[in-house]
């Protein structure tokens, strides 16, 4: 299950089951949606851009192609804690003269994930600590996701999704690659391929959603990672969670209490 070809479909299926459980127990209508990396497919389903069947099929192919690219390129990723984006970019610029390394996720202030060739990630661990990072932790992942090493997978994926219907969203999807609100189905179809080799702008996504009037967030799926990130992005944000029966019941009770 550790390989991305297995984890991606499993995580999405779990997330969609949690979403359907919430919808069956609570009469809520979302005003917007977003998802972090793989989670964007849950967002596309929520916005009625993709059917459940197509979302799962597409995710399975995405996972397969990313797994192939990961096996071919042997990349890695690392989390950088408590170092400015400016200092990170400065360090990466030095290493980019030797090969492919870049930012994968702008998760929240003080937490950035980098991605690229394994030997460069290993060098970055030392270099970014020297530049003042509190910690730089190489992640237990099977590849350099959201990097140029995934470009081949993205090109094949773009061909694959051509055969699927991406409807116009009934609500905006705040998309990973530039944090903009998108409803056009054709635009979203193009963006899902680009997302495979581009950074996830989560900090900007949440900031934009709050600026556009979103007041309450519900994190659907495995765990409470995004709730923690959201709190660091904006301390006023309220994020509920649905990932098991207990969290479902707690979220329903809280939503009813707060109307």
Where are these regions (language model features)?
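FabD-like malonyl-/acyl-CoA
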Residues: 1-88, 139, 216-246, 250
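Glycine-rich phosphate/pyrophosphate-binding beta-alpha loops
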Residues: 7-9, 144, 199
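Non-catalytic positions within long, well-ordered alpha-helices that form the structural scaffold/packing
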Residues: 23, 129, 210-213
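Alpha/beta catalytic cores of group-transfer enzymes, especially the acyltransferase/condensing modules
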Residues: 47-197
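Cys-dependent protein tyrosine phosphatase-like superfamily
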Residues: 167-171, 175-176, 181, 189, ...
């Amino acid at each position: 299950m550790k390989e991305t070809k297995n984890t991606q479909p499993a995580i999405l299926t779990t997330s969609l089951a949690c979403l359907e459980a919430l919808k069956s127990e609570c009469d809520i209508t979302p005003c917007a949606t977003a998802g972090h990396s793989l989670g964007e497919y849950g967002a596309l389903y929520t916005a009625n851009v993709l059917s459940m069947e197509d979302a799962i099929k597409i995710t399975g192919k995405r996972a397969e192609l990313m797994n192939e690219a990961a096996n071919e390129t042997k990349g890695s990723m690392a989390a950088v804690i408590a170092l400015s984006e400016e200092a990170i970019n400065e360090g990466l610029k030095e290493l980019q003269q030797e090969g492919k390394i870049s930012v994968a996720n702008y998760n929240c202030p003080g937490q950035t994930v980098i991605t690229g060739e394994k030997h460069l990630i290993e060098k970055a661990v030392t270099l970014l600590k020297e530049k003042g990072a509190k910690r730089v932790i190489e992640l237990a992942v099977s590849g350099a996701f959201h990097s140029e090493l995934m470009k081949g997978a993205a090109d094949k994926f773009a061909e694959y999704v051509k055969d699927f219907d991406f409807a116009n969203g009934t609500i905006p999807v705040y998309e990973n690659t530039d944090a903009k609100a998108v409803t056009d189905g054709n635009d979203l179809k193009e963006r899902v391929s680009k997302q495979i080799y581009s950074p996830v702008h989560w900090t900007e996504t949440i900031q934009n959603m709050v600026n556009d009037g979103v007041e309450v967030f519900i994190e659907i799926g495995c765990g409470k990672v995004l709730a923690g990130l959201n709190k660091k992005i904006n301390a006023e944000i309220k994020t509920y969670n649905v990932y098991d029966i207990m969290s479902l019941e707690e979220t329903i009770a809280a939503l009813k209490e707060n109307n």
